[in-house]
């Protein structure tokens, strides 16, 4: 719904209920297994979104994603309340000192108990050792199915807009530091493969900038280094991966040109 209501997609684009679950097993089981990333445009701003698995069985994916983001939207069912996977993901977010926003979804569901669910979330925050700032988490009440949201638990206040979520993200979650003038640091958190460009490293530019044609160095997990030339860069917008010429600190991108690259490895300038 965030994709639909942002300034990102063509109005004719048809989205299913689980637009970011593209893996066959995900579609079959109705769960997220592999982390996905996208970005939405809201006015002149951009929000990078990473959809992460919630289940502890896919913990490696969750931990890698938590290292790429500045905050989390914790989505909790207004009827079911907190689940085992809620605890798992939240614990990982707190370990990274991330800023939380709670979204109580499905408030239109029969038997929904949004106010009680917020109390459950607060209890869980306390149990997991949230600090004072994290305990002051903002709450949005929503129905993704209906495309509505509100800052009030009263169902009558729901309006057909995701603006409360967008506004809360901008107000609550810090923007990336502007350190594009520093030496490059790009960390690979996810991998992909394309028959045309080979192995692709996906991750976040933490410092500096990277351009197509740059000669860069991979700091390997075994302590060795390997040089390569950046052949292509891709950014993410909506459901598309788009070619770009340059990326700067804060961007989530995909990089090709590396024959061998592994999750957790870092790309830097050769001089550093």
What kind of feature is each model-predicted range?
Residues 1, 60-62, 84-87, 111-116, ...:
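Short acidic, glycine/serine/threonine-rich loops at helix termini
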Residues 1-76, 80, 120, 191-194:
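P-loop NTPase switch module centered on the Walker A-proximal segment
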Residues 3, 55-56, 79-82, 106-112, ...:
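Conserved nucleotide-binding/hydrolysis micro-motifs of P-loop NTPases
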Residues 30, 49-51, 65, 73, ...:
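Residue-level signature of catalytic and energy-coupling elements of molecular machines
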Residues 99, 108-174:
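Canonical P-loop GTPase G-domain recognition
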Residues 185-272:
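Conserved nucleotide-binding/hydrolysis modules and their immediate coupling elements
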């Amino acid at each position: 719904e965030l994709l639909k209501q942002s300034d990102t997609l063509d109005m004719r684009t048809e989205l299913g209920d689980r637009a970011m679950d593209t893996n066959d097993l995900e579609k079959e089981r109705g769960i997220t297994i592999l982390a996905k990333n996208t970005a939405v445009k809201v006015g002149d701003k951009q929000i990078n979104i990473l959809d992460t698995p919630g289940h502890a069985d896919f913990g490696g994916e969750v931990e890698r994603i938590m290292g790429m983001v500045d905050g989390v939207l914790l989505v909790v069912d207004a009827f079911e309340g907190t689940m085992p996977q809620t605890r798992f993901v939240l614990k990982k977010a707190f370990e990274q000192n991330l800023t939380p926003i709670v979204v109580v979804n499905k408030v239109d569901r029969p038997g929904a108990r949004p106010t009680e669910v917020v109390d459950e979330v607060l209890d869980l925050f306390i149990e997991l050792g949230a600090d004072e700032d994290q305990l002051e988490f903002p709450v949005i009440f929503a129905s993704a199915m209906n495309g509505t949201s509100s800052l009030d638990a009263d169902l009558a206040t729901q309006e057909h807009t995701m603006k409360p979520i967008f506004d809360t993200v901008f107000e609550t979650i810090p923007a990336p530091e502007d350190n594009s003038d520093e030496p490059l640091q790009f960390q690979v958190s996810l991998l992909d493969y394309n028959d045309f460009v080979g192995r692709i490293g996906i991750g976040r530019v933490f410092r500096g900038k990277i351009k197509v044609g740059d000669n860069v160095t991979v700091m390997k997990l075994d302590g060795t280094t390997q040089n390569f030339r950046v052949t292509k860069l891709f950014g993410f917008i909506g459901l598309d991966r788009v070619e770009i010429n340059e990326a700067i600190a804060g961007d989530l991108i995909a990089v090709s040109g590396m024959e061998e690259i592994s999750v957790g490895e870092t790309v830097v300038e050769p001089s550093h």
